[in-house]
Every structure is written in C-alpha cells, then in structure tokens.
C-alpha cells in the first residue's frame, strides 16, 4: 500500500488482471479492512473480502461489534421514523442486523428485513437483481407480524446495508424495486450503509430521494484486465 497525492492506494495483481483501489485519508489502513480475491465469474473477476465482517474470514465478535457501533455513530442525529433496515443476502445479513441493533438503541421505531435468494411461502414485497453476482435474483418478503408490517407501511427512512458498494447499482436496483412495489410510499430519505464504499458519486447522482451514505472508508477502484 502507498500514499499518492494524499490518497491511500492498494494494488493487487490477479491471474486475469490488476486492480487498484484508492481512498481518502482514513483512520483505517486499507489492508486492515479488506483484501482482494479472485473468483470464477465472467461478470466480475475480483471480490472484495472483508477482514471485519466475520463471514469469509474468522473475526473476533468484539471487532465486529465495534464495527457496528462505529457505523451507527455515523448516522444522522435525527431519523424521521419509522425506519426500515434492509440487509443484503447473504453477506450483509449479519452486518445489517448488527447496525440495526445499535441504531435502535436510540431510534426504537424501526424494523429489520433481509433479502433472500430462496423463495418461501410468504407475501412478496419486491424482487430485484444484483447484476454482477453469480446468483442475481433477490427476494424480499413482508414480515408476518402485523405490527412490523405497519412499520414498513409508515416508514419515512430507508436504510440499505451491504458489505461494500462497488458501483452502487445493486442499491439502486433495490430502491427502484421498492418504489415500484408501492410498499414504501412515505419514505423521504435513504441511508446507504457499507463497510467500504467504492461507488464514487454514482449513488448520489442516481438516487431519486435525498441520500446519506455511511461507511468506514470510501474511494474508487480501477480494473485493468490482462
């Protein structure tokens, strides 16, 4: 890792190309938060692997809880409620639950949903695509509990949680599907939460609602195929 023009730069060469990641000055060295792995996927040959998520690499629960707390502390001081959190399957289901758990200490009027790739016998809220994934289709179902369903219907703040945002396209696809479903008509603001955000200005430029982003680090990436 090196520093160039005030940015931190991390480079890695894979068998099919080279990726360069840069971020603004941060409390976290880039290599403390993630590494880059190669994968057999023609849509995207590389994968950001988190070192603090606790999914692909074993992580102390204390480290994970500290991450949830730090992300929650970056939320706006006031949230218009109710609040709906959505964690992305499969990687961010635990991350979303952890951030939700921390935020609801101060904003109890909220509910947590997750996407899934598995059809279940329940009422479908919406479906959307994670286009770069090996398994593109995501489903979100309504809660069974009547009180939670009412929270969803009345929600004014929508929180979307994923482990990382590479282009921001998945968040935008989900938001479009939710708006098309008519289920969250009262939402006024979106909060996009990630451990690492490489999407640049894409979310701000394309989000149809006021947006606040939360991440431990943000920056950009460049892929050079070989």
Name each model feature, range by range.
Residues 1-226:
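PRPP-associated nucleotide enzymes
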